Regions:
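Gly/Ser-rich catalytic serine loop of serine hydrolases
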Residues: 15, 155, 189-197
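Short, structured patches in soluble enzyme cores that scaffold and shape functional sites
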Residues: 107, 150, 189-191, 214-216
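Active-site entrance/lid segments in N-terminal catalytic domains of soluble metabolic enzymes
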Residues: 1-180
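Conserved active-site-proximal phosphate/metal-binding subdomains
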Residues: 159-186, 194-346
Length: 346
């Protein structure tokens, strides 16, 4: 109802993977496409949004933008940084001018001035959270929608499982109203959702829709490099890990030789760097350079982070986004029908 979409599926704003073509395809197929804008300049974000709109079948169809907005300074992690490079006001202006219907803030609460300005232009604001306590902080600045991501999810994520997190967040926001719509604040579920069963589960837990990332990394329209897609297809149930070595915040990625070595053999160094406000990979690279160590191209490739959730273990094919969404809806309907039949046995 909020976005006039037919399917309760939102594309996670995964930066390069969730590019203009994929975001438009999700919107064209009845969902809501969201592009990631980590590190984007205002000029580049505008170009990405212009490209996205060029792919839309309905030029008035909804889409969104996701930015990383961690708190910097004060009691925040010393490794936090301003991913916008001081250009958030300009980025907000670009988002407003583009006609976006949704703004998403991840890894932090958006500043109230930004929420107020977006509301003044009819744009809904959503906050990503990984723990129930974060919901109240987001609502305090006027956020309209809460997206709760369980630890199974790829990228920056918390420690609470989706099946536990969603009901707790649903309960915590019950009775809370969106400042923009005056209606109940919806909860979007994320983390480990890759097919219709996950969608059905999320709805049964009280969520209003799902935020899907890893499954769409393996979409034909995704901007993810082929190596990233192949890594998703190869991954097993135990092949991802949460680590702080790339951004200073816990982030779920595929295990590679570099991250495994860091976590198993350099835990003290990771902490020492973090205490000084240095991200481990940056500090380690500097140390190696000073020691005259040179990385081979292969070592550099292996050290690159490939973000993905635990759902990667259940994905075995790169398919069109439309097929992924069709199967997700069909699977959810089948699961919910089965649930109705099971209800008689309770």
């Amino acid at each position: 109802e909020l976005f006039n979409i037919k399917r309760p599926i939102l594309l996670a704003g995964m930066n390069v993977a969730a590019g203009p073509e994929l975001a438009a395809e999700v919107t064209n197929n009845g969902g809501l496409g969201v592009i990631g804008g980590v590190g984007y300049t205002p000029k580049f974000l505008k170009a990405q949004l212009d490209e996205l709109k060029s792919y839309l079948n309905d030029k008035n169809a909804p889409f969104g933008v996701d930015l990383l907005l961690p708190q910097v300074g004060g009691s925040a992690r010393k490794t936090n940084k301003d991913y916008t490079g001081g250009t958030l006001p300009q980025l907000i202006d670009i988002i407003i001018e583009s006609g976006a219907k949704l703004f998403v803030s991840a890894v932090g609460i958006p500043p109230k001035w930004a929420v107020d300005k977006l509301h003044g232009n009819g744009i809904l604001c959503m906050n990503m959270i990984g723990a129930p306590k974060h919901a109240a902080k987001a609502l305090a600045v006027g956020v309209d929608i809460i997206c709760a991501q369980g630890t199974e999810g790829g990228g920056h994520t918390g420690q609470v499982a989706t099946s536990v997190l969603i009901p707790m967040v649903v309960d915590s926001v019950r009775g809370k109203k969106s400042p923009l719509t005056g209606k109940q604040v919806p909860v979007i579920a994320a983390g480990g959702i890759f097919d219709g069963r996950g969608l059905a589960m999320a709805l049964c837990l009280g969520a209003d829709a799902v935020w899907v990332g890893t499954r769409f990394v393996a979409a034909e329209e995704a901007g993810a490099p082929p190596a990233h897609q192949k890594a998703v297809l190869r991954a097993g149930p135990h092949d991802t890990i949460r680590s702080t070595i790339y951004t200073g915040r816990p982030m779920r990625i595929i295990k590679n030789t570099y991250v495994v070595d860091a976590e198993e053999n350099h835990a003290e160094e990771i902490k020492e760097f973090a205490d000084r406000g240095i991200i481990y990979m940056q500090g380690d690279s500097r140390r190696r350079k000073e020691a005259g160590e040179e990385w081979s191209v292969q070592q550099q490739m292996e050290a690159r982070p490939q973000l993905m959730g635990q759902a990667s273990a259940a994905i075995d094919a790169v398919e069109p986004a439309s097929k992924i969404m069709d199967e997700m809806i069909a699977g959810a309907l089948a699961t919910l029908r089965r649930g109705v039949g099971m209800a008689a046995k309770l």
